Amino acid sequence: MSRDDEGTRGRHGSTGVQGITNNGRRVVFEVDGDTLDAPVAPGQVLRTVLRDAGVHSVKKGCDAGDCGACSVLVDGDPVHSCVYPAHRLDGRAVTTAAGLGTPDAPHPMQQAFVDAAGFQCGFCTAGMVVTASTFTEADRDDLPRLLKGNICRCTGYRSIRDAICGVGNTVAPAVGEAAGRSVKAPAGLRVVTGREEFTLDSPAPTALLHIAVLGSPHPHARIVAIDTAAALALPGVHAVLTHHDSPATLFSTGRHEDREDDPDDGLVLDPVLRFRGQRVAAVVAESRRQAELARDAIVVEYEQLPAVFDPEEARLPGAPLLHGEKTSEVSRIAFPERNTVAAMHGETGDVEAALAAADATVEGTWTTQRVSHGSLETHATRGWLDDDGRLVLRTSSQVPFLVRDEIAHVFGLPEDRVRVFTKRVGGGFGGKQELLTEDLVTLAVLATGHPVQYEFTRDDEFTIAPTRHPMRVRVRLGATADGTLTALHVDQLMDTGAYGNHGVGVMYHSVHESVAVYRCASKRVDAESVYTNNLPSGAFRGYGLGQVIFAIESAMDELAIRLGIDPFELRRKNVVVPGDAMVVTDPDEETDLIWGSYGLDQCLDLVEEALAGPDAQPAPEGPTWATGTGMALAMIATMPPRGHFADTTVELRPDGGYDIGVGTAEFGNGTTTVHTQLVATALGTTPDRVSIRQSDTDVARYDSGAFGSAGVVVAGKALWAAAHKLRAAMIDRALTLAGGAADVVDGGTAPEVVPGGVVVTRASSAGSAGSAGSAGSAGSAAGPAATRLVTVDELLAGGPLVADGSHDGTPRSVAFNVHAFKVAVDRSTGEVRMLRSIQAADAGTVLNPEQLRGQIEGGTAQAIGTALYEEMMLDGEGRVLTTALRNYRLPKFSDVPETEVHFATTHDELGPLGAKSMSEAPYNPVAPALANAIRDALGVRPHELPMSRDRLWRLAR
């Protein structure tokens, strides 16, 4: 549950104190050195008092005291402001991250976090820094206990530990040599001081209205009648929106470059409800509390419909149909008559014959659970009409341009009448590649003409936001005695939930690189994405690969055991190498996937060598403990299929710096840092001289968005091209001003773009020639070179200097990751201790080593949570039982081992400066590597995620 501003318990977010006067009081206290005299409603908490007063350095993550994003100091002691009673504030001194220091004069701990690169999205950082600012040197040995109240979903905690312990991980950039160095994030000082804006971190517009949503109490029902009269009669209510107000245009919440990649199976407000919590109606009122009171006054008559919750049952004849009234032609649902969103059945060779002839076979079924993205910033949108009557949406999205396009499509608006922009986004992991709040805000803004805000609570994130797809994956393998793989069959079934957002793409992607990474003459894939009356599934880090790789790599490990072959050697013998076709089931399939570079062999070697080294900590002693090692590998395409586009600009500023325009959003993916590094390298400057305009459909050119690991290899490549075009234009203009290109050709050196302008060097004439026609004439002799700096003022006197660059995301390369663990497992309790964690990554040219290391550590930490304890629990009727972070265990500081990170030495011919993407890839091999290590320790194989203590205890017995 979540605590709102007035102390009531609800599932629709914090409430302002507007209109609440009964039993209220005022408190006077100090905030960051200033006196605040604030109204306080009964039961209100410190966080909402601060936010209502415009103190945006305090964040909302859970409103339940679980995550620590809201941490502040009260009289010098760290507290969770979301549960600290506001009535206790009289006479106290509150310090937020903004009060600890400023970007110009940061607190030493704030500077340490910048120097250590101790954040990624940065949403947890203000609270983390506030807590850490109270630590003494002696506390460094007790960080697991002291940080148990602060969660970071992004980093994996190693860089946070480094910051607290005074370890610097970043360096100053050299002029023109920023790429390849661990430079600081441009927004670092603003993030650590709480001044970097996230989605709702700006003063609310006047007359801002709030949305509260009535959710369906049934998993499958039709609205027969809905009475909103009592709700509309309540004070402060401006509108109650129902399916009668909804546009009739079907669409998908999942966003892709090609909108036809997802089925059109939903409406903004639908008269047929297909999962518990689905929108029935939305109240728009002057305060959150008023909206919630009105929501509770709505009277609805439902016709309950049969429901189905298991995908195996859902595709059987006679099962209740979720979208049976829709057609394949209109909605692009493969088989609506049997609840199948998408299906793939293909074979190359003869799998059954190959299995029959194999010297060794392995067969097993692996299941993976429903997982929450766990981004600490919840989904939120604020919308309004600007002075020209254009719709403006400020939102927490990975894909602002795709949101704009779909909003225009659904509401019948010209695209140029819609502006969508993001500020910094507090985590994504695929969860914000959806359209979840923007459509309802649009409907409310157009209906009322007022600014409107809709913010998810943590409860909403669990009960109505899409999750990772649960899958059941059956794998059959066959091999010869020497380990040559002869048969590979993957039979995958996934629960896409009530709607098909990402249900097609995840299905196809999950069985692509996971299968294509192995050479095998006979392969078969059977895969289906099936509707159920559970809450929708969606995009999640790895986009389906993590689930299927867990199964295939577990089966490969079992095959190695059956054959008595080392697991590293079995992989080396069977993985694809340059020159091989990357085949799933069709050897003749046309594809834009090519070998831009190859480092899988290096990754296998690096991990095997590291695993042979000494352990970081000794294994626990005792008769119930057993140790084991395990490894797994993964391949991933370096960008999404079917097109991904970026149009960018780079412009020379009058002060000699550069402005870049790029549509990619920043949510911890690190693209902002790398984009400035690339431009600075191309233009002979440093990243601090490069400013960025991004993720705004009005101020940047088109970009498909930050998903599919495309931020560097698509938008980055477009910026690299734009920077080089600008460099050429600057040189051309400088040569004209310096006397023409001929002077350079005749003895000079190439012009150089430097801070302040362009240096042109040309040969000077020296000596004198004899009289014309004299026999002794030797002509002129070259003298000392003359160097001239053509200044920025001179360059811009001829007009603006701006260049553009584009990339369409094709062809695509592949990246590789190999992970290994050494673990100890207690047979008597099921406890797992990770003694070693090692990952090698083939990322091409590493543009920012520390940042990339952080991506790998963060992906590993997230995958450890998925592997060992994260699980969204649903009952047998689709009711979500996991509704708060305290009963959904995100990895904490004490849970995550330090991962040894190694990089293969490769240079990709497709990526900018030879780089490959590496934001999703590190996640994929972790769970199977851990499962294989547990199998080695216990002698029995886990087949189900999470591998929780109770499951392992039962397995060990």
Describe every region a protein language model picked out.
Residues 2-176, 193:
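Signature of N-terminal electron-transfer/Fe-S-associated modules in redox systems
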Residues 117, 181, 187-193, 255-263, ...:
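Glycine-rich loop/linker segments at domain edges
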Residues 165-333:
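Flexible, low-hydrophobicity surface segments
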Residues 189-190, 211, 296-309, 398-401, ...:
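Extended active-site and interfacial segments that coordinate phosphate-rich ligands
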Residues 244, 412-417, 447-452, 506-638, ...:
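C-terminal catalytic domains of large/alpha subunits in multi-subunit enzymes
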Residues 279, 286, 450-496, 717-752:
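Phosphate/diphosphate-binding loops
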Residues 321-411, 575-657, 881-892, 900-902:
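Helix-loop-helix junctions that connect adjacent transmembrane helices in secondary transporters/permeases
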Residues 428-449, 453-455, 671-678:
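Thiamine diphosphate
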